Regions:
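Bacterial N-terminal signal peptides
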Residues: 9-22
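Divalent metal-binding pocket/active-site signature
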Residues: 184, 188-242
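Short, small-residue-enriched loops and turns at beta-alpha junctions
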Residues: 199-204, 230-235, 261-264, 294, ...
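Polyanionic/metal-chelating signatures
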Residues: 133-140, 155-171, 177-181, 197, ...
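Active-site microenvironment of metallo-dependent hydrolases
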Residues: 19-57, 62-63, 72, 113, ...
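N-terminal secretory signal peptides that target proteins for export/translocation
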Residues: 1-6
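Divalent-metal coordination cores built from histidine and acidic residues
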Residues: 83-88, 92-99, 104-195, 214, ...
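Structural recognition of the beta-strand scaffold that forms the well-ordered cores
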Residues: 94, 119-122, 147-150, 225, ...
């Protein structure tokens, strides 16, 4: 209990103390009026994160650690919180999150903690802060409501070495310098290497460059998270390159946002899974993450893999592969905001152009302003998503983040729990929770997170399995999820009954 200076009015002191005690009791009903750093959560359905069946019980936390779980009774002085039969699980770990800028503007991370995320890994797809040490120091000075970790981005490192002269294969001395910088980033606290090989900077790298940088990360105990070179017609070829990199670098894999993103590969999920399963059976440490939507969010150039953005035939094929121009929607375009929230087909019609001509116009307008249009592409099918999610080696991850103009930024984890578990019965509840907790913790080599066990970090989420659901949409992507009742980060309550508490106990987790 906070102490107060003696004032002239003892009555004022009594009133103030009574008021503060009442507030504390509203958040945590107590067995007595004594304060304590121990919290007992009773009457919970405990999901331990391993995939084991849920069990009724209680969980005791002291400070930032879980002390015990099971059949427990209150002890004198500890705060008691009644879960009233709700599920209590480890906090969700988002292994692919884009909140680098959002954490500065919104450290309470409301869209993230409202869906149960307690740790968000930054710097995926090859783009990370630099230097890593500076970013970590800044985050520690300005903590968020959730924990963060960070990749060393391959494209970021490539630009450090090659500058703007990156549109070519790197020389051997340049590759060696990239490996050295990867070493530096890992020494400074990065948890692995990420790459984005569909994006411009990373797309010019060859396999040898990626092996060299991945090997440097592996030597420091890191893993390789990759947005592979193609998720469309050449998805199988790109997958084989990923496997080759992992084999040569001796590094564990996280295949980012596994998908089959064009008409030509729709329905081939089980063929794709077979290639991965064969690699896993011979010993490759291969996991993947997946978001629960049939639409992706990126820049407008990624749909043309040969980079011939003003070639009519290349653009025509790209749009056909997506299923048509009505499947591509502009989300952000600074040179002409009037394009935003319209499909390419709608824009073409209103401007009396063909979809190909409209695409090329947007490319030219963007290049003139040194920017690119943000787009959402509706180019996956549900049966492929289902097949991927039902694999035991696939994790849940958002590929979203604070302020992202895609519903996955605010809805990913509740969407899986509400739609894929409760409504569609694709997954059992324990298995879905495992994909959000202990499986990403395994990839990150964090044995004290992602599980409910004695000694583990008290990152926790309490939710109602009957009501948890995403509410974010493509029209309103920031709408908060429902059904997440309470979230604890490092033992502190950060989300309570639909509102942030204002606490910011998040830490930076380093390798």
């Amino acid at each position: 209990m906070r102490s107060f200076r003696r004032t002239a009015s003892s009555l004022s002191l009594v009133v103030l103390l009574a008021f503060s005690t009442a507030l504390a009791r509203r958040a945590f009903p107590q067995t007595n009026s004594q304060s304590s750093d121990t919290i007992l959560i009773i009457n919970a359905q405990l999901a331990d994160g391993t995939g084991a069946p849920l069990r009724e019980g209680a969980l005791r936390i002291r400070g930032n650690r879980i002390v015990s779980a099971g059949k427990l009774s209150p002890t004198s002085g500890e705060r008691v919180l009644d879960a009233h039969g709700l599920v209590l699980a480890p906090g969700f770990i988002d292994i692919h999150n884009h909140s680098l800028q959002g954490l500065d503007s919104d450290p309470l991370a409301e869209t993230q903690i409202a869906q149960g995320i307690t740790t968000a890994v930054q710097g995926p797809d090859g783009e990370s802060p630099w230097p890593i040490a500076n970013w970590i120091a800044a985050r520690r000075k300005n903590p968020a409501a959730l924990n963060v970790a960070v990749f060393a981005g391959h494209a970021t490192i490539r630009e450090q070495v090659m500058g703007k002269d990156f549109k070519r294969v790197a020389t051997q001395p340049e590759i060696e310098k990239m490996a050295q910088l990867t070493w530096q980033a890992m020494n400074e606290g990065a948890i692995g290497l990420s790459s984005g090989l569909e994006y411009e900077v990373g797309s010019y790298s060859n396999t040898a460059e990626l092996v060299a940088t991945a090997r440097a990360a592996a030597e420091h105990g890191g893993f390789y998270s990759t947005h592979i070179r193609d998720e469309a017609d050449k998805a199988f070829e790109a997958l084989l390159e990923e496997i080759e990199i992992a084999d040569q670098a001796h590094i564990p894999i996280d295949h980012s946002h596994i998908k089959l993103g064009t008409v030509g590969v729709w329905g081939k999920a089980y063929e794709y899974i077979r290639v991965i399963s064969e690699a896993r059976e011979r010993g490759l440490d291969f996991l993947a993450d997946c978001y629960p939507y049939e639409a992706w969010h990126s820049n407008i150039k990624v749909i043309v893999p040969d980079k011939q953005y003003e070639n009519s035939k290349s653009v025509e094929k790209a749009l056909a592969d997506m299923g048509g121009a009505d499947h591509l929607t502009i989300t952000a375009f600074k040179p002409n905001p009037s394009y935003e929230h319209h499909s390419l087909a709608e824009l073409a019609k209103s401007n009396k152009l063909s979809p190909v001509e409209m695409y090329i116009r947007i490319i030219r307008e963007g290049d003139a302003a040194n920017t690119e249009a943000g787009v959402i592409g509706h180019s996956m099918i549900e049966s492929d998503i289902k097949a991927f999610y039902q694999q035991p080696w696939v994790m849940v991850a958002s590929d979203g983040g604070i302020g992202v103009e895609h519903p996955r930024g605010a809805g990913t984890f509740p969407r899986v729990l509400g739609r894929f578990v409760r409504e569609k019965h694709w997954l059992s509840l324990p298995d879905a929770i495992r994909k959000m907790t202990s499986l990403p913790a395994q990839r990150l080599n964090w044995p004290d997170r992602g599980v409910l066990k004695e000694g583990a970090i008290a990152d926790l989420v309490m939710f109602d399995p009957a009501t948890v659901l995403d509410r974010s949409t493509f029209v309103n992507p920031q709408q908060l999820a429902v059904g997440i009742e309470k979230v604890f980060v490092n033992g502190q309550l950060v989300w309570n009954s639909g509102k942030p508490t204002g606490a910011r106990p998040g830490v930076v987790i380093t390798r």
